[in-house]
Each structure stands twice: as structure tokens, then as C-alpha cells.
Amino acid sequence: MVYFAQFNLNSDAIAMVTASHNENGWTGVKMGIKKGLTHAPEEMKELKDITLNQKFINGEGNIKKIDDFQNVYKNDLITKNPLNKKIKAVVACGNGTAGIFAPEILRSIGCEVIELDCELDWTFPKYNPNPEDLEMLHAISSAVKENKADIGFGFDGDGDRVGVIDDKGNEIFSDKIGPVSYTHLTLPT
């Protein structure tokens, strides 16, 4: 949602409190400049040095609270992505924050949704919410086959990465997802 907000609000920079790539119990901040780019490790090291050594530049800034932005995000996705046919989808959120929005958005665009670990639970009791984690992928694969679903989606802890499982229970690798997404997003309907 933070990347969407950066474009939607025409913001120069972003900061998101997240633990997406950290072990359970650790939280971090993902920061970015320019549209769609997060800071590289060297830039994060520089920011860490500035913070720890209090090398701040005093200046003026402002805060603007935007009420109900989560619904702005959901509505944008829903209105821009209607489905032409009903799809049965397993949605695995690994008990992470994607459980707040992914099932609802997919239902709203016309999917029949089978939820898998979509309740928020910071202990992540079943598996690491990582679409590259084999335990998560196997759980999605089993649920797709058991429910005769058309597709399975597995979201990471903060919802900015997704893994995809086909109707046979096999992972669709990102080198295939990218071109299909590109074609869908660029061809006229």
C-alpha cells in the first residue's frame, strides 16, 4: 500500500514500518525515494550513520493525515481490475497484514476466495509468511488441489510480494508471472 500511496499522493519519499525480511520478533523500516525505488544497502548504511551520530539537518516539514486511505487503495484495485470470469482462489497470508485486504479485494473483483491463514497473528504459528518459503508454498499447493481452485496466492508478511500456484498445485515462477502481467496490463481490452 505504501508504494501505491507514493504514486497516488505524489510523494517524494516513503517509509514503511515492516518486518518483511526480518526474523520474527524484529521490525525495521523500509524507506524509499523516487517512485517505486527503495533505498539500497549503501543508502541505508548512510541513514543509519546519520541517525546514530545525530548528523541531522534541521528543516521544516509537515504531516498530513489522510483518513481512510486503506479504502482508497482497495477501491482503486477493485475498480481497475474486474474479472471477466469467476475464479476460485486460495489466498494465503501467513497470518501477516495482507490478510487485512487481500481476501476482500479478491472477493470484490469476482473471485471465490478460500482463505488460508489470513487472521493476523504476529507469532506466525504455521509458517514464515514468505512466498519463497517451501512450507508456505506446499500449504497453498495442498489447499489449491483439495479445493479444486484455479489459482493460489501466497503473500509475504507485509503484502508487497506474492507467490503464485497454478490449478495443478505447481508454483508459477516470477519469470512467467512478469510477462503475463505485462501483457495483461499493456494490451487494450
Language model: regions and residue ranges:
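Ferredoxin-reductase
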Residues: M1-K35
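Conserved small/polar residues in nucleotide/adenosyl-binding loops
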Residues: T183-T189
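Self-splicing inteins and homing endonuclease
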Residues: L52, F56, I151-G152, G157-G169
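Solvent-exposed alpha-helices and their adjacent loops that cap or buttress functional pockets
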Residues: Q6-L9, N22-N24, K80-K85, A143-N147, ...
